[in-house]
Amino acid sequence: MLKPKDLCPRAGTRTFLEAMQAGKVHLARFVLDALDRSIIDCRAEQGRTPLMVAVGLPDPAMRSRFVRLLLEQGAAVNLRDERGRTALSLACERGHLDAVQLLVQFSGDPEATDSAGNSPVMWAAACGHGAVLEFLVRSFRRLGLRLDRTNRAGLTALQLAASRGHGTCVQALTGPWGRAAAAAAARGSNSDSPPGHPAPAPSPERRRPSPRRLPRPLLARFARAAGGHGHGHGHGHGHGGELASAGKGSVRYRAQGNERPELGRSMSLALGTMTEEETARLRAGALMARPNSPQSSGSGRWRSQEVLEGAPLALMQAPVGLSPHPEGCPGSGRLGLRRRSTAPDIPSLVGEASGPESGPELENNALPFSVPGPKPWQAGTEAVVLQAQR
């Protein structure tokens, strides 16, 4: 029984080659593992490696198994023997297509020439292996094959095939695949610098565009909006204050100035900056008659409207604003319409206009934001409050 300690590199090489000739794949694998793959590229007769011996095996099944085993274990593909022949050159000479396919898959060179100047393509053309030659030209149709290369006798692969009457080889070399491979090789050779001439200077690279960045005005605008976001709730309560609204397209609004953005009705109510037309429209909506209301008179008009009709002109022209009038508890957040007057003879309507059913809905989208509480009323001041439900 063969043991690993009985093997040396010379004995291991002989045992491995004998296992290949006998078709013993397991024994060959055992020898490679025992010697740590040190004999995988060892030299035998005529300087040939085990891979060169494997491509010449007559049995196709054993040949494929041993060639794949050696290639997967790291055997060198393009090593040469004493005559400069490679494993691919030997496989093309014998016409072993399966071995040629494996060698090309593991980067076998089809243009490696031997001592006579013959390449694997020339060996396949000279020996009449049309299938092998067609596989080579198809595999290298993009990388290119120098089909016009001559050996030391001055013959090309096409001349070698034609001189020996190998029509299939001639057809493979002159067919579309052969022309494509020759054209690709010609393009590659034209791009190379001729001998003795320096390579052309590389063209200057185009300046790469800088990464896309936002314009400076837009960045400054975002910075201002981010800086004013935390101050938008604290300003705008006083009569002469400023309201800074944060967000995209934020603007600064001065209450005492005429230049203000177009605000919605809800925002106008919230800021207390309604125009005279808006105030009149709101007053008309608040005093609209509701016949079924318990607070309406027999004529269908609001009692508050009757009182206002007899009120002095100072009350009718009093400024209209919004205050968080409570519905039973302070700070309920319900926005109401408050009219202030200094006339002592106008009765208070606070008690009559309380409750959720005290008036029509003035605004459906009123803003539920917090506003400061009303100032304490002075002595002798009466108020008329008409609540506007949201």
Curated annotation (Swiss-Prot):
Q: Name one Pfam family in it.
A: Ank_2
Q: Which Gene3D superfamilies match?
A: Ankyrin repeat-containing domain (1.25.40.20)
Q: Which organism is it from?
A: Mus musculus (Mouse)
Q: Is the Hydrolase keyword given for this protein?
A: no
In this chain, where does the modification Phosphoserine occur? 193, 304
User: Annotated region Disordered: where?
Assistant: 181-213, 226-245, 320-377
For this UniProt record, give its keywords in alphabetical order, as a comma-separated list: ANK repeat, Phosphoprotein, Repeat
| Sequence ranges of the ANK repeats | 11-40, 46-79, 83-112, 116-145, 153-182
- For this entry, the protein name equals Ankyrin repeat domain-containing protein 63
